[in-house]
Swiss-Prot record:
The gene is TAP65. This is La-related protein 7 homolog. Disruption phenotype: Critically short telomeres. Reduced accumulation of telomerase RNA TER. Keywords: Chromosome, RNA-binding, Telomere. Residues 247-335 form the RRM domain. It comes from Tetrahymena thermophila (strain SB210).
C-alpha cells in the first residue's frame, strides 16, 4: 500500500514537472514571438520613415526641376521677347536708312542721319535679311535657309546680294583711297586698282569681314570655324505672318499721285517698318490703297485712332479735283480680309444666281415668260442738282468709292435715254481715277417706253441702287465722313445733294421700272434667239 502511494506521488510529481516545463517553454516561445513582432514593427517603422524621407526628397527634386524649367522657360520667353524687339528695331533702322530722305525727322529720331560705320552697316543689313519682316516676303532666302543643314547658311551666299555688294564696294573704295591716295572721281576711274577691285580684297577677306561684323549680333549666331550664320531663334512663318498682320493697317481713298514719301509724311509720328503701295503698271500712279506695317500693334492702333477719317494736308495738296476724295479710311488688316471675303462671297452668289437664270432661260419654252423682281427696301440713294451736260463717266467717277458693286441709273439728255450702268469694282479699281478699268454694263431704255418714267428721274438726277440695305448704309456713312457730316457729293466742281430716304411711292415706281427694264431686255434677247432659230431652220430646209 505504501509502495502504491509512493508510485502515485511520483507520477503526479513527474506530471507537475512536465506541466511546469511546458508552461515555461510556452512563455519563452510567447516572449520570443513578442520580440520578433517588436523587431518587425520597428523595422517597418524604419522602412516607412525611410520611404517617407525618400518620397519627400523626390518631391523636392521634382519641385526644384519644375522651378528650374519654369525659370528656364521664363528666361527663354524674355530672350525671345528681346529677340523680337531687336528684330523690330533693326527693321525700323533699315526702313529709315532707305527712306531717310523722304521726310524731315527731328535730330533725336533721325537715327541714321549720321553715316554708319561700314561694319555696322554690314551687320545691320545681314540682320535685316534674317528678320521676320524680310523672311515673310523673301521666299528665295527662306528656301536657302530651309535647305541648309540646321538652318546654317554659308556666308559666301550673301556676297551675291545687291545690298551686300554695295556695302563691300564702299569698303573697297575706302581701302583704295587710303592705300593709293586717290582723292577724286577722275582718279578713281583711271586708277588700275580701282578697276580691278579683286587686287585689294579677296573673296576670303570679304567673308571674314562679314563674319567679324556679326560677332556682337543679338539676332544671329556665327560659327567661326565653318563660316556659317543662323538665327538665334528659328523662323516660324505662320507666327511671323500673324504678328505682321496684327500691326498692319489698310489705308484707302488715296489720290493717284500719292507716294511713299506722302505716307511717311502723314504717319511720321509713328515708327514704320514697311510700306506696300501698289502702283498701276502703265502710269505708275497709286492704285488708291496701301498697307503700312508699324513697329508694334499698339502703335498701329494709335495710328488708326488718330488718323482715321482725317483729311491730311499732304493729300489735299495732291488732289486737284476732290471727286469722291478727301478723308482717308483706315482699317485693320483683319477687317480688310473680312471685307475682301465678304465681297468674294457676294460675287460668288451673284454669279451662281446669274448662271441659274441663264440655265432656266435655256430650258424655257418658245413662248416668252416675264419675270418678277424682288423688291429690296432701303437700298437706294438719289443724287440731284447734277450739272447740265454731265457725262455718265463723270457720274460713275464721282460715286465709284461708295461700294464694290452697284447700279447707277442716269438720264443722258443727249440721247433722251436712261443709262443704267452696272458698276463692278475690285478693291483696287474702287479707288482708281481712270474709268477705263471699271466694268460698266450699259442698258438703254427710251423714256417713252415706260409709264411714269419721267417722274422717276428728271434732268440732273441719278439713282444709285446697292445690293442690300447694309451697303446703302455704308455708302451713306462714307459720304458723311468725306463731307463733314453732309450728304453731298462733288461732280464737275459743283456740290450735288444726296437723298438717302426715297418716298415709298417713288421707290415702288423705281422697282416697277427695274422689272420692266429686265423683261424688255429678256424679250429682246428672246426675240433675237428666236430669229436665229428661224434662220437656221430656213437654211436647213433650203
Amino acid at each position: 500500500m505504501d509502495e502504491y502511494l509512493e508510485n502515485t506521488n511520483l507520477e503526479e510529481l513527474e506530471q507537475e514537472c512536465f506541466m511546469e516545463d511546458y508552461q515555461h517553454e510556452d512563455v519563452v516561445e510567447q516572449e520570443n514571438h513578442q520580440v520578433d513582432a517588436n523587431d518587425i514593427y520597428e523595422n517597418q517603422q524604419m522602412n516607412d520613415e525611410s520611404q517617407l524621407n525618400q518620397d519627400v526628397k523626390i518631391s523636392q527634386q521634382k519641385e526644384q526641376a519644375v522651378e528650374m524649367i519654369e525659370e528656364q522657360q521664363q528666361n527663354n520667353q524674355d530672350k525671345f521677347k528681346q529677340f523680337q524687339d531687336c528684330m523690330a528695331h533693326i527693321t525700323e533702322l533699315n526702313f529709315k536708312r532707305n527712306y531717310q530722305n523722304l521726310t524731315e525727322q527731328s535730330s533725336s529720331n533721325n537715327v541714321v542721319a549720321e553715316e554708319l560705320d561700314i561694319k555696322e552697316s554690314l551687320k545691320l543689313q545681314m540682320e535685316y535679311y534674317f528678320c521676320d519682316t524680310n523672311l515673310t516676303h523673301d521666299s528665295y532666302l527662306r528656301g536657302i535657309i530651309s535647305k541648309s543643314p540646321k538652318n546654317c547658311v554659308d556666308i559666301k551666299v550673301f556676297l551675291k546680294f545687291n545690298k551686300i555688294q554695295q556695302i563691300l564696294k564702299q569698303i573697297q573704295d575706302k581701302q583704295i583711297v587710303s592705300t593709293y591716295g586717290i582723292e577724286n572721281q577722275s582718279q578713281k576711274k583711271n586708277h588700275k586698282n580701282y578697276k580691278n577691285q579683286n587686287a585689294t580684297f579677296s573673296k576670303k577677306d570679304l567673308i571674314h569681314l562679314i563674319r567679324d561684323s556679326l560677332k556682337e549680333s543679338k539676332i544671329l549666331k556665327v560659327k567661326m570655324d565653318s563660316l556659317k550664320v543662323k538665327r538665334r531663334f528659328p523662323f516660324n512663318l505662320e507666327q511671323a505672318l500673324k504678328n505682321s498682320k496684327q500691326r498692319t493697317l489698310y489705308i484707302d481713298f488715296l489720290p493717284p499721285k500719292c507716294s511713299k514719301q506722302t505716307l511717311v509724311s502723314i504717319f511720321g509720328n509713328f515708327r514704320i517698318i514697311n510700306i506696300n503701295l501698289p502702283l498701276q503698271k502703265n502710269s505708275q500712279l497709286c492704285q488708291g490703297f496701301a498697307f503700312i506695317e508699324f513697329f508694334s500693334e499698339e502703335e498701329a492702333n494709335q495710328a488708326l485712332i488718330t488718323k482715321n477719317s482725317s483729311i491730311p494736308k499732304e493729300l489735299i495738296l495732291l488732289t486737284e479735283k476732290k471727286i469722291g476724295q478727301g478723308s482717308i479710311r483706315i482699317i485693320t488688316y483683319k477687317k480688310w480680309q473680312e471685307e475682301k471675303q465678304s465681297f468674294k462671297e457676294l460675287s460668288k452668289n451673284q454669279n451662281e444666281q446669274k448662271n441659274k437664270n441663264m440655265n432656266q432661260s435655256r430650258k424655257a419654252s418658245d413662248e416668252f415668260v416675264s419675270i418678277d423682281v424682288e423688291i429690296k427696301q432701303n437700298c437706294l440713294i438719289k443724287i440731284i442738282n447734277i450739272p447740265q451736260g454731265t457725262l455718265k463717266a463723270e457720274v460713275v467717277l464721282a460715286v465709284r468709292h461708295l461700294g464694290y458693286e452697284f447700279y447707277c441709273d442716269y438720264i443722258d439728255e443727249n440721247s433722251n435715254q436712261i443709262n443704267s450702268n452696272k458698276i463692278s469694282l475690285s478693291t483696287q479699281q474702287q479707288n482708281t481715277a481712270q474709268c477705263s478699268n471699271i466694268q460698266i454694263e450699259n442698258n438703254l431704255i427710251q423714256q417713252d417706253q415706260h409709264p411714269q418714267l419721267n417722274d422717276l428721274l428728271k434732268e440732273g438726277q441719278a439713282m444709285i441702287r446697292f445690293q442690300n440695305s447694309d451697303e446703302q448704309r455704308l455708302a451713306i456713312q462714307k459720304l458723311l465722313n468725306h463731307n463733314n457730316n453732309k450728304l453731298q457729293i462733288e461732280i464737275r466742281g459743283q456740290i450735288c445733294d444726296v437723298i438717302s430716304t426715297i418716298p415709298e411711292d417713288e421707290e415702288k415706281n423705281y422697282w416697277n421700272y427695274i422689272k420692266f427694264k429686265k423683261n424688255e431686255f429678256r424679250k429682246f434677247f428672246f426675240m433675237k434667239k428666236q430669229q436665229k432659230k428661224q434662220n437656221i431652220t430656213q437654211n436647213y430646209n433650203k
